[in-house]
Amino acid sequence: MLRDQTDNTMDMDVLDDVPISDLNYETIQGYRNRHRALKPAHPFGRLNDSEYLRSIGAAAISNIDKCLHPTAAGMLMFGDEYNIVRHFPEYFLDYREILDPTIRWTDRLQSSSGEWSGNICDFYFRVYNKLVKDIKVPFKTIDGNRIDDTPVHEALREALANCLINADFYGVRGIVVRKEADRIVFE
């Protein structure tokens, strides 16, 4: 997008009026645990939470008060929905499973439900698990270890991540992921 063609993109903006405590601690810990499991020797694993958030671009030192605050990206990724919408009023994530055409939906997950954090990170993992639950996994081993990942799993991860990462949360429409009997739609 034209507005992102600078050295500092809008998701790097420091939210000077937001304390770092407005980020969801459980989401951050879950993300860090996944990072540790995937890359146990990564140097970020030794950082405290504040240093970690700075290292991944989720927080930065404000030029105004010289304190650590979430960035726009950090708020979207790790904030609670009720805090996110203060900065992104049209923010909305919606997963709809429509497997029976006679029913409006058979499963639904909305960022605004209040039943979970509503942030991008938690949405990604919750929705990914819903998308892949019906995928057939053929028996395959490599070096004696069972491989449960298929090219379809990889494609779904990539499509969901791209949909969320490349979304314009400053715009007027949220993200809708629809799982239907014969297709998956990202919009």
What is the meaning of each model-derived region?
Residues 1-187:
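Active-site helix-to-loop segments that bind/position phosphate- or nucleotide-bearing substrates
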